[in-house]
Regions:
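Hydrophobic, well-ordered secondary-structure elements that form the walls
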Residues: 256, 299, 319, 327, ...
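Contiguous mid-protein beta-loop-alpha structural module that forms a pocket-lining wall or clamp
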Residues: 307, 322-324
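Short, surface-exposed connector motifs at secondary-structure boundaries
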Residues: 2, 67-68, 220-227
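Terminal RNA-binding accessory module
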Residues: 342-432
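Proteins enriched for Cys/Gly/acidic motifs involved in redox and nucleic-acid/cofactor modification
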Residues: 1-202, 239, 244, 250, ...
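Conserved glycine-rich "GG(E/T)P / GGGxP" loop and the immediately following alpha-helix
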Residues: 47-52, 189-220, 232-239, 266, ...
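Radical SAM/AdoMet-radical enzyme domain recognition
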Residues: 186, 211-225, 236-298
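Conserved strand-turn element in the central/C-terminal portion of the radical SAM core barrel
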Residues: 160-167, 225-234, 260-270, 285, ...
């Protein structure tokens, strides 16, 4: 039997798809590309925006149209957040949520065997539920591995449906995480990314913490680099920063969630910090890790309900002043099921798109300036995708993308390079 996967959304979703693929393979399935045709089609959905829901439905329709005898599966955040709507999708033979992923295989077998024509198996998240283990030992990119350490979010930001889709915070046991890191190191992975729905919440429910986890992860032989997923500034303490700065294997690149550079807009979003508080945390990171050694990246939403032109200009000025290496800019997407859906003073679509273009232009200018300033510096780069026998793509510890000329080296090695010119997308670099 052959199975095909289609993944929407974040790194956690991508990690979970890989784990599901591994689960299917362990039970006799062969994972194939969509073009090769399959007996089972699985879409792991994202529901952050309505557009994500639409893409999930579109892919299911195409899979069913082109392979009418196949079993189609809709799983993940979309059905979990909107179970009644998802259950009515005719093109989905199996509908499951973001929990109890191990049951997907059993649900699929019921349809394959003719026991059921449709299975809807969406179980509500409960406070006190445990982290669901989904072992993952290999990745398409054999250089960087993503390790999920936490699920769920206890916050209630006005624009976000994720707590509804993912349930409450629940942390994976440190023992399980370290066991996975050892397996990954034995398989040749030297860089790992700790991912989560709410990474700084790790350990809040178990009496541990993120800094402690990083310290112990760094002790795993063979793991040379550790990266962190998204962090909330108000949850990063002075002690966390001090302890993280003492871990040499930790890459000094921090995705510090902002969402808006206007304190007024942050209040409307129900984010629990001001721009002044955000700037203070960013300054502490720069001081602890070194101004030239650290990079900070972030996300920014433009066109949130009630955002005036002045609010937007304040946001753009703050973002430019923070000198982020990379900024993901999103026009606000009105999401049913969130408080902001009903907020007054919705910003017109054309204005949101205009603000998105203006913000993007501003942050790309800063990105280019930072890349040009790095020219001539020495950096450590993990060689990733080979472009030829001597050219590789990769990233510095600060997550600056590079193309490295490295004759005699191979993917998966960490090499010392001299950074060169920025071409608008990557720095040219030469291995020393």
């Amino acid at each position: 039997m052959r199975v095909c996967f289609y993944t929407l959304g974040c790194k956690v979703n991508q990690n979970e798809t890989g784990a599901l693929a591994q689960l299917f393979e362990q039970n006799g399935f062969t994972v194939v590309e969509e073009k090769d045709g399959a007996d089972v089609y699985v879409v792991n959905s994202c529901t952050v925006t309505n557009f994500g829901d639409q893409k999930s439905r579109k892919w299911l329709r195409r899979a069913k149209r082109e392979n009418p005898g196949a079993v189609t599966v809709l799983t993940g955040c979309y059905p979990q957040a909107f179970p009644e709507e998802a259950a009515k999708i005719e093109e989905a033979d199996v509908v499951t949520g973001s929990g109890n992923r191990h049951a997907i295989l059993q649900d699929v077998q019921k349809v394959l065997n003719g026991e059921e024509t449709k299975v809807v198996d969406i179980r509500p998240h409960q406070r006190g539920e445990n982290f669901e283990e989904l072992p993952m030992d290999r990745f398409a990119d054999h250089t960087r591995a993503f390790v999920k350490v936490e699920d769920g979010c206890n916050r209630r930001c006005a624009y976000c449906v994720i707590p509804r889709a993912r349930g409450p915070v629940r942390s994976r046991s440190e023992r399980s995480i370290l066991e996975e890191l050892r397996r990954l190191a034995a398989s040749g992975y030297c860089e790992v990314v700790l991912t989560a729905i709410s990474l700084p919440s790790y350990g809040k429910d178990t009496g541990t913490g993120l800094a402690e986890l990083v310290e112990h992860a760094a002790a795993v032989a063979g793991i040379e680099r550790i990266r962190l997923g998204s962090l909330d500034p108000d949850m990063l303490t002075d002690d966390d920063i001090r302890r993280l700065a003492a871990v040499p294997k930790l890459c000094p690149q921090f995705h510090l969630s902002l969402q808006s550079g206007s304190s007024k807009t942050l209040r409307a979003m129900r984010r629990p910090y001001t721009t002044e508080q955000y700037a203070a945390v960013a300054a502490k990171l720069r001081e602890a890790f070194g101004e030239e050694n650290v990079s900070i990246t972030t996300d920014v939403i433009v066109g949130f309900p009630g955002e005036t032109e002045q609010d937007f200009e304040d946001s753009m000025a703050f973002v430019a002043g923070q000198r982020f290496l990379k900024v993901h800019v999103f026009p606000y997407s009105r999401r049913e099921g969130t408080p902001a859906f009903d907020f007054p003073n919705q910003v017109p679509e054309h204005e949101k798109e205009s603000r998105s273009r203006r913000m993007t232009a501003a942050v790309e200018k800063v990105r280019a300036e930072l890349a040009h300033a790095a020219q001539g510096r020495t950096a450590q780069v993990l060689l990733e995708t080979p472009l030829s026998s001597t050219l590789f793509t990769g990233y510095t510890k600060q997550y600056l993308p590079v193309v490295v000329s490295a004759p005699g080296h191979k993917s998966g090695e960490i090499v010392t390079v001299t950074l060169g010119e920025w071409d608008g997308k990557r720095c040219r670099a030469q291995a020393q």
